[in-house]
């Protein structure tokens, strides 16, 4: 009886040990599976977050670039009208031809409208680049976004200066058509002061332009190099 009891006890202990091993295995397997599922979920969340940040960064950069490209193109059109306005004005000074002063006034008016549009578009582009900075931590990207923001500010500065210069030139042409030479002289003195300011603003503008045009992901606009 004692031997039979001992044998049964050994069998029970063996069965219990096997059961413990099996249970331990299943518990470990469940824990491992749970850990893997948790890591996979975290990984997927991180991927979604990265993709979302990349999409937002690209979207804001693209929208800002579209506004900026438009501003640059419109500024070139404004420069075209401005150059003709000054050309007709200088000829009118020599010939006293009212048709030429009318041409100057017309081109000044068109230039002012284009400069104002360019000014507004430069301003509209800046917030997109500022927001894009929230979606990247890369030093290079933050650096180039800083150039974009600086360029938009420089663009607003130069277009507003030229808007004011066009206004003085237009008023000078109007006074020239009436023969009010004292007014013409005073207005052209202010015009000259602003044009001197334009030269400094153009230098700053071009420095930012060369910086951003050096980056491959910037869609360059073939602007006519500024001579002033």
What are these regions (language model features)?
Residues 97-100, 140, 147, 151, ...:
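Short, solvent-exposed helix-helix connector turns and helix-capping sites enriched
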Residues 60-67, 71-91, 114, 121, ...:
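C-terminal amphipathic alpha-helix
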Residues 1-39, 118, 228:
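Secretory targeting signatures
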Residues 31-109:
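Immediate post-signal-peptide N-terminus of mature secreted/exported proteins
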Residues 102-113, 145, 188-189:
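Short, charged, amphipathic alpha-helical segments
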């Amino acid at each position: 009886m004692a031997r039979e009891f001992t044998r049964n006890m050994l069998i029970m202990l063996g069965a219990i040990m096997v059961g413990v091993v099996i249970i331990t295995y299943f518990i470990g397997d469940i824990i491992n599976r749970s850990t893997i599922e948790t890591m996979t979920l975290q990984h997927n969340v991180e991927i979604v977050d990265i993709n979302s940040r990349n999409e937002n960064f690209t979207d804001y950069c693209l929208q800002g670039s579209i506004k900026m490209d438009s501003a640059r193109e419109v500024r070139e059109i404004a420069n075209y009208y401005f150059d003709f306005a000054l050309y007709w004005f200088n000829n009118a000074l020599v010939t006293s031809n009212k048709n030429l002063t009318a041409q100057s006034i017309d081109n000044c008016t068109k230039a002012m409208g284009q400069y104002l549009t360019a000014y507004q578009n430069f301003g509209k582009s800046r917030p997109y680049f500022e927001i894009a900075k929230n979606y990247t931590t890369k030093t290079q990207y933050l650096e180039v976004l800083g150039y974009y923001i600086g360029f938009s500010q420089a663009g607003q500065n130069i277009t507003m200066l030229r808007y004011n210069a066009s206004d003085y030139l237009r008023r000078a042409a109007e006074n020239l058509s009436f023969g009010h030479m004292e007014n013409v002289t005073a207005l052209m003195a202010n015009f000259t002061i602003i044009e001197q300011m334009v030269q400094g603003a153009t230098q700053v503008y071009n420095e930012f332009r060369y910086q951003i045009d050096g980056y491959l992901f910037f869609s360059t606009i073939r602007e006519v190099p500024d001579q002033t």
